[in-house]
Amino acid sequence: MMKITLKKGILGFENLKEYELLDIENEDILKEFNSTEEDCIGFIVVSPFEIIKEYEIVLNQETIEKLEVKSPNDIMLLNIITVGQTLEESTVNMKAPIVINVRNNCGMQIILQDEEYSIWHPLLRGDGGC
């Protein structure tokens, strides 16, 4: 378990700033990202590199400063999954990753301006994704 403080919360849940990142039993790729302030708020997240191996973002200077990033090795990225009726209908928001500094456990959700990534990227794909 890892406790994480989000500087601005998550889009739609801006008032909730404290979260726990938890392993899911018998699951290597997916994680739980649960609010510690509101019991009924939680998300399933995945590393974007499990979905798109070449996933790449550029952090702006403001984000680097707010999260106190000193090195690219400080960063962990997570993306929120929207669970569908089936796994085939489930999607990953690749456009709004949660950026976490693993040195100080502070994070932010950012919205990428890059049109390359979608908020509805399929969780299951034939190109090496989950």
Curated annotation (Swiss-Prot):
Gene3D superfamilies: BH3618-like
Any GO BP annotation: regulation of translation
Superkingdom to which the source organism belongs: Bacteria
Main localization, broad class: cytoplasm
GO (cellular component) term, any one: cytoplasm
Subcellular compartments: Cytoplasm
Family from the record: Belongs to the FliW family.
Name of the protein in its database record: Flagellar assembly factor FliW
Annotated organism of origin: Clostridioides difficile (strain 630)
